[in-house]
Regions:
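Short N-terminal secondary-structure initiator segments
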Residues: 2-10, 14-15, 20-25, 163-180
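Non-heme iron-sulfur electron-transfer modules
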Residues: 2-20, 44-74, 92-121
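General secondary-structure edge motif
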Residues: 12, 21-22, 59, 68-69, ...
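Short, intrinsically disordered, charge-biased short linear motifs at domain edges
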Residues: 17-29, 65-77, 216-218, 345-348
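Short, glycine/acidic-rich beta->alpha junctions
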Residues: 20-24, 81, 246-247, 378
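Cysteine-centered iron-sulfur cluster-binding motifs in ferredoxin-type domains/subunits
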Residues: 26-45, 71-93, 129-130, 202, ...
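Short acidic/polar alpha-helix capping motifs at helix-coil junctions
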Residues: 41, 48-50, 176-179
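Iron-sulfur cluster-binding electron-transfer modules in prokaryotic oxidoreductases
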Residues: 95-400
């Protein structure tokens, strides 16, 4: 016992003297008043007895982790990074950010099973997988939809066979834009830049086309960044912080170039991408994005501002009853009221705002076999509200 204590003391001294251990320290945890409001709203704590909750994993754990790198906790992997803990925190402690950084450090020091590491790399490297699969989309989509394929993916990579994998588009949004839209966008005097992200580029180009239609209808042209990569969020939460940091710097540089050369704002319709570009690049990865942050916008607050400026859209009545689900990262950023105000512009549309709660999928989290039951349990109340509501459609900014 004495030897173990001495070993921890020696390790703590070495850790405290290391510059690297303090490189991205967020000292906001000292503001924690131990009210446990974060634990009360945590969707994982309510559904997984193995997770101690955001207070213990975040601020409480951080005090220990600063003393010794050995005091990391395997339970950190259960956090979904929904950030509802940060919304609830009266002291503005970046609880989710503390947990993500600690988890990445823990994964770097522990031995993750090889197949799980391969799975996480596949799920996280969305640009790589998109470039490989979009040219072969009809074949890939057919194969990944087979029961035999799902069975093999679960047995080998621990990807749940109960999940439906996203379908790939046959051709990217970016290639469509360059061939069919680029020239037409030059006629508009006012322009915005569009950060389309992975989902639009590889899975749902139609969403990007609709984005263009909306802004063009307001007499605003849409440009693309000269280059862009995945926002890096999947890499950041799955134990690949160095690669995520390189991507974050790449995107920040090209967003900065667009702003410097054209003086226009950068818009994204993806809530997690928007939050990552604006906040997490700095908070979690240590990227200096202070210059570009004021010019990066989520689409609905930006549209709301355009309406205030007097811009209009030729909207036809839509006699539908729709449910609005506040995505986790929308809740964190406070964007939901803007989305609701934009939706209210549509004549005859009845909007029912669902109680704000996590859907459980959390990007790549819910695709993992070990998380499937937990993710379904987290989302159950939301699913029940939707199924019992008799809605024509469900609206959300969350692409997953």
């Amino acid at each position: 016992m004495d030897n173990n204590i001495q070993r921890l003391i020696d390790s703590a001294k070495q850790s405290l003297n290391s510059h690297e251990s303090h490189k991205y320290i967020d000292e906001s945890f000292e503001s924690c008043i131990k009210c446990t409001a974060c634990t009360a709203v945590c969707p994982v704590s309510r559904n997984n007895p193995l997770y101690p909750g955001p207070k213990q994993s975040g601020p409480d754990g951080e005090r220990l982790r600063l003393k010794s790198a050995e005091l990391y906790d395997e339970a950190l992997k259960y956090c979904t990074n929904c950030k509802r803990c940060e919304v609830a925190c009266p002291s503005d402690v970046k609880i989710g950010d503390l947990i993500v950084r600690a988890r990445n450090n823990h994964l770097a020091q522990s031995k993750k099973p090889l197949m799980n590491k391969l799975r996480d790399a596949i799920l996280s490297n969305t640009d790589v997988m998109g470039k490989i699969n979009t040219p072969l989309a009809p074949i890939v989509n057919t194969i990944t939809g087979l029961k035999a394929t799902k069975f093999m993916l679960e047995k080998t990579l621990n990807i749940s066979k109960k999940r439906t994998l996203p379908k790939y588009a046959f051709g990217t949004f970016r290639s469509w834009y360059m061939k069919n839209a680029l020239q037409d966008q030059q006629k508009f005097e006012r322009k915005v830049a569009y950060f389309h992200g992975c989902y639009v580029n590889y899975n749902n180009p139609q969403l990007g086309k609709e984005f263009l239609k909306v802004f063009n209808a307001m007499n605003i042209g849409v440009m693309l960044l000269e280059k862009e990569k995945c926002c890096g969020l999947p890499l950041m939460v799955n134990g690949f912080p160095n690669r995520a940091r390189n991507i974050a710097q790449f995107n920040t540089d090209y967003i900065g170039k667009m702003i410097d050369e054209n003086g226009i704002d950068v818009i994204s319709e993806a809530s997690s991408c928007s939050l990552n570009l604006r906040d997490e690049y700095h908070h979690i990865l240590g990227i200096d994005n202070a210059k570009v942050r004021p010019h990066i916008h989520m689409v609905t607050p930006f549209l709301y501002q355009l309406f205030k400026e007097g811009k209009t859209l030729p909207l036809k009545p839509l006699k539908l009853r729709v449910a609005y689900h506040t995505a986790c990262h929308v809740d964190k950023a406070g964007w939901a009221p803007y989305t609701l105000e934009v939706l209210k512009k549509i004549p005859s549309l009845e909007i029912i705002m669902l109680p704000s709660q996590c859907c459980g999928i959390a990007g790549t989290y819910g695709f993992k076999s070990e998380n499937y039951e937990i993710s379904q349990s987290i989302g159950k109340n939301l699913f029940d509200n939707i199924n019992e509501g008799g809605f024509d459609y469900v609206i959300s900014e969350c692409q997953t």
